[in-house]
From Swiss-Prot:
NCBIfam families: pcna (TIGR00590), PRK01115.1-3 (NF002220). InterPro entries: DNA_clamp_sf, Pr_cel_nuc_antig, Pr_cel_nuc_antig_C, Pr_cel_nuc_antig_CS, Pr_cel_nuc_antig_N. The gene is pcn1. Sliding clamp subunit that acts as a moving platform for DNA processing. Responsible for tethering the catalytic subunit of DNA polymerase and other proteins to DNA during high-speed replication. Homotrimer. The subunits circularize to form a toroid; DNA passes through its center. Replication factor C (RFC) is required to load the toroid on the DNA. Gene3D superfamilies: 3.70.10.10. GO terms for molecular function: DNA binding; DNA polymerase processivity factor activity. Keywords: DNA replication, DNA-binding. It comes from the Archaea. This is DNA polymerase sliding clamp 1. HAMAP family: DNApol_clamp_arch. One of its GO terms (biological process) is regulation of DNA replication.
C-alpha cells in the first residue's frame, strides 16, 4: 500500500477535530478511497470522513487495509507539518504504518497499527428546514466569539439570512446574508431555530480550513449538520445533537 497526498495540512485539520471527539480512530482504506466514522463518548456528535482515491496524488491500494491510531499521538506527529508538504502513507505489513512528511526535510515515522473497533452507527434519515452555504472563515469567527460568552449557540434563519448568537453576561450575534457576501446560498422550507452546545462546535472548528464554504443544515430540535467539501471530491460531515431545554 502506498498513498501520497500533496497537502498534509488537510489531514492535520481533520486529526485536530478527531482529537476532541475520540481517543482512537480507524481509517478504513479501500481500493476506491478512505473512510472514517467516529462518535464521541457521550453520543452527542458524529464525524464522517470520505476521501475518494481521485483526490490523491498517488493511490495504490490493492486491497482493504484498516489503520487504527491514537488521535493524540497522530496530532503531535502532524503538529510540525508545513504548507505544501506531502504526506506519504505506506504499509508492507498489517502491524506498522510508515508515515513520511515530505518537504524541504523528510521526516519518517513508523506508527503502530492499533486495533480500533468501528462505531455502531444507527441509520438516520434527517430532514432539514434550512440548508445554507456559509463563508467558512466567517462561520469560524462567529463560533469562536460565541464560545467566549456563552455555552449555547442559538441559530435561526429565514428566507434571506442566517443568524447565530450566544447570550451570557454579554451577547454576541452574527448575521450571514447574501448582501454581505457571507451567505452564498440558502434552501428554505420554513423559518426555524434551534440550540446547540457551542463547545462541541468550537472543538471541530479546524475543519473550516478544508473548504471556503461550509454547508449548514438544521431544523427545530433536530441535529445540526455541517458539511465541508474539499478539492478533489473529499467530504467531511459533522452531526451535532440539539441542546434541548
Amino acid at each position: 500500500m502506498r498513498i501520497v497526498y500533496d497537502d498534509v495540512r488537510d489531514l492535520k485539520a481533520i486529526v485536530q477535530a478527531l482529537l476532541k471527539l475520540v481517543d482512537e480512530a480507524l481509517f478504513d482504506i479501500k481500493p476506491e478511497g478512505i473512510q472514517l466514522v467516529a462518535i464521541d463518548k457521550a453520543h452527542i456528535s458524529l464525524i464522517k470522513i470520505e476521501l475518494p482515491k481521485e483526490m490523491f496524488k498517488e493511490y495504490d491500494v490493492p486491497e482493504e487495509f484498516k489503520f487504527g491510531f491514537n488521535t493524540q499521538y497522530m496530532s503531535k506527529l502532524l503538529k510540525a507539518a508545513k504548507r505544501k508538504e506531502e504526506i506519504i502513507i505506506e504499509a508492507d505489513s498489517p502491524e506498522v504504518v510508515k508515515l513520511t512528511l515530505s518537504g524541504a526535510l523528510n521526516r519518517v515515522f513508523n506508527v503502530n497499527n492499533i486495533e480500533v473497533l468501528p462505531p455502531e452507527v444507527p441509520e438516520v434519515n434527517l430532514e432539514f428546514d434550512i440548508k445554507a452555504t456559509i463563508n467558512a472563515s466567517g462561520f469560524k469567527n462567529a463560533i469562536g466569539e460565541i464560545a467566549e460568552v456563552a455555552d449555547t449557540l442559538l441559530i435561526s434563519a429565514n428566507e434571506e439570512k442566517v443568524i447565530v448568537k450566544g447570550e451570557g453576561e454579554n451577547k454576541v450575534e452574527v448575521e450571514f446574508s447574501k448582501d454581505t457576501g457571507s451567505l452564498a446560498d440558502i434552501e428554505f422550507n420554513k423559518e426555524s431555530s434551534s440550540a446547540y452546545d457551542v463547545e462541541y462546535l468550537n472543538d471541530i472548528i479546524s475543519l473550516t480550513k478544508l473548504s471556503d464554504y461550509v454547508k449548514v443544515a438544521f431544523a427545530e430540535q433536530k441535529p445540526m449538520q455541517l458539511e465541508f467539501n474539499m478539492e478533489g471530491g473529499g467530504k467531511v460531515t459533522y452531526l451535532l445533537a440539539p441542546k434541548l431545554s
